[in-house]
Regions:
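Short, Lys/Arg-enriched N-terminal segments with co-localized hydrophobic residues
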Residues: 1-14
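A short beta-strand-turn-helix
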Residues: 17-34
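Short pre-active-site segment immediately N-terminal to redox-active cysteine/selenocysteine motifs
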Residues: 33, 40-43, 86
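ABC family nucleotide-binding domain
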Residues: 38, 51, 62, 81-84
Length: 121
């Protein structure tokens, strides 16, 4: 499983998210923690724009969930199997099953609300 890491400079926090491939997807979503997966592509401007908020969420919620990213260009079979038609799409998994999803969240607050509402279900 690969990791994307950003260097810490001048008080900035290190942000880490898991880069998910086909071999690791099934294993990851069956973890005991909740798993939040961002389906995205590098050519998607909106995906890149919301990426910083997603990285902050992955750090702030690391005690309750694992955050990962699936590049649909590199892993189209995962996107197809999960019926991802629009990007960015965030999917929350529990015990190997998708429990909720959100398409094109507009802000970090929207992602937080999505997670909190899903946790209440």
């Amino acid at each position: 499983m690969g990791y994307i890491k950003f260097k810490q400079e001048k008080g900035l926090k290190i942000m880490t998210s898991i880069n998910i491939n086909k071999e690791k997807f099934g294993q990851l979503i069956h973890k005991e923690k909740l798993v939040l997966v961002d389906f995205w592509a590098p050519w998607c401007g909106y995906c890149r724009r919301i990426g910083a908020a997603y990285e902050k969420i992955s750090e702030e919620y690391s005690d309750i969930l694992i955050a990962g990213k699936v590049n649909i260009d590199e892993e189209p079979q995962i996107a197809e199997a999960e019926k991802i038609e629009i990007i960015p799409t965030l999917v929350l998994y529990r015990d190997g099953k998708a429990i909720d999803s959100i398409v094109a969240p507009e802000s970090k607050k929207m992602i937080e609300n999505f997670i909190n509402e899903a946790l209440e279900k």
